Amino acid sequence: MEGVLQTRGLLSLPSKPKIKAFYPLPQGGLRNRFNSLSSLKPNPLNGVSLSSNGFQKVQGFDTKPQLFGQKKRCFPICKAEAAAAAGAADGQPLFVEKEQPKFMGIELVTLKKIIPLGAMFFCILFNYTILRDTKDVLVVTAKGSSAEIIPFLKTWVNLPMAIGFMLLYTKLANVLSKEALFYTVILPFIAFFGAFGFVLYPLSNYFHPTAFADKLLNTLGPRFLGPIAILRIWSFCLFYVMAELWGSVVVSVLFWGFANQITTVDEAKRFYPLFGLGANVALIFSGRTVKYFSSLRSSLGPGVDGWAISLKGMMSIVVMMGGAICFFYWWVNRNVALPTRSKKKKVKPNMTTMESLKFLVSSKYIRDLATLVVAYGISINLVEVTWKSKLKAQFPSPNEYSSFMGDFSTATGIATFTMMLLSQWIFDKYGWGAAAKITPTVLLLTGVGFFSLLLFGAPLAPTLAKFGMTPLLAAVYVGAMQNIFSKSAKYSLFDPCKEMAYIPLDEDTKVKGKAAIDVVCNPLGKSGGALIQQFMILTFGSLASSTPYLGGVLLVIVLAWLGAAKSLDGQFTQLRQEEDLEKEMERASLKIPVVSQNENGNGPLSSESSLNPAGGDSTNASSEPSSPRSL
């Protein structure tokens, strides 16, 4: 019996109990049953007592009637009040939780997280695709502007705005709850895009300083066309910056921060890659939406500002999707419980902005994450800006440019959807480290193909003419394929890898680290690529002349990216192991014995002599001490 009571500190039952005879209870209950059976007499267990809730319980033995000449044996009737009380005191259930209901092999509790998160991601990326395609058309095709404005915007406008937002976000994170912080950040975006479509763009001719910009251009010369264009079309540039911030703030900080808050690492491994399935369906549909509005502009009669009509329609969709995002966020906060984390986390301190930056810079883990983000931004920018310059030359009109971008977004969605289907298999078979290295490898290989075509396009002109293409058109298509494959790898593997890396961190590093990396490092990567290109142009005279050197820079950046991914893989694995060990230790510390050996303790029975009192009938003692009896 002692062996039974000591098993893992819990009251154990046999895995395959033998069926014993049961007798119907009299109307008076179990106590009257014993009183009514005169042939059965209690056999006291001297020297042994069980404690429940601090009170002594007198224990007795009751034997079955002799059936078919069975050997008489005594078994205790054990009560588990002590176990229940001990379990309740620690908040731990005495018995195993019953299995959660499932649908298609997935727990319903998990589905309550995954479906709304997938819908949120769908709406966020639907908006991002529309905003991304629209911002380039606005600033590149505006009167008095050109593609030269983009590097200046990324370096001298977008980066300072991103840094300013990060500083503000860090301060707000110290004083607002997570839910209030989410609404405080996303609602100004929704309001601005609605106001731009219905107020700012229709009235832009009244507050754009066109005459003043013309005077500056005549005075300073065409070399300053880009900076002057920022002043000339400042409201369009503000739209450009807000669209860029939507990608870094709403996608990276708000959505992924919320997803990391309510999911576990195991759920993230299984479902993070699948979040992109709904998101890339959004890419396909949003690409078709941009394509539709491009055709609408071309079908309107002369004298009608078709672009203004298109903007009103697209910004209305953006506002409606923003409302849906807020609804899904509200619903999840009201209906989904947060997962239990290891309690051994750092206490969140109140840090100043400079202290936060110093803390983040001192962390090797955060530095490696920042390297991944900056390297991606520089690498994709080195190829993408060069590709957009060729795209502008091939499709100079806004209608053609926007129509091609709609097709590009649709193709990106299809390619990414396919990669999403493979991503979970990649995570399961090869792990986090291999998945993190796929994106830089893809970008390197496709980038080499694109730059090679730019360098050796002239000798290939006769061959390309047989297929009805010029070297310029071929470069546009190859560059489009490079961007499609790189972005699909980013959405399906790079983003989930990056977000999974935040999960083992403590809450303070997670919140402030995401703000610093996603809001500052992402624009820093793009601005860094733009600065490299500006330096190359000033040094070698043109973008075409600097193409071989840009390819060399791309190689160095990607190699640094791969090194940071390898370093982060080791740190991530170590943190996961430490967190799992902490959880195991916490669970082990909560397990306590059930039956007390004295009136004050909860320890197991100390000796077998208490089960065999002196002077008692040893034959009546339990002959099967390790097999509990069904009563």
UniProtKB/Swiss-Prot annotation:
Give the UniProt keywords, A-Z: ATP-binding, Chloroplast, Membrane, Nucleotide-binding, Plastid, Transmembrane, Transmembrane helix, Transport
* Start and end residues of each stretch annotated as Disordered: 586-631
Polar residues bias spans: 595-631
Keyword ATP-binding among record annotations:
yes
Q: Does the keyword Plastid apply?
A: yes
UniProt membrane topology term: Multi-pass membrane protein
- List the subcellular locations: Plastid, Chloroplast membrane
A Pfam family assignment:
TLC
The secretion signal range is none
The UniProt entry, under InterPro entries, shows: ADP_ATP_car_bac_type
Named from the GO MF annotations, one term is: ATP:ADP antiporter activity
Mind telling me which residue stretches traverse the membrane in this protein? Answer: 106-126, 149-169, 180-200, 238-258, 271-290, 313-333, 369-389, 407-427, 442-462, 465-485, 543-563
- Which terms in the GO cellular component ontology are assigned? chloroplast membrane
Main subcellular localization, coarse class?
Answer: plastid
Q: What NCBIfam families is this protein classified in? A: AAA
The similarity annotation says: Belongs to the ADP/ATP translocase tlc (TC 2.A.12.2) family.
Q: What is this protein called?
A: Plastidic ATP/ADP-transporter
Originating species: Solanum tuberosum (Potato)
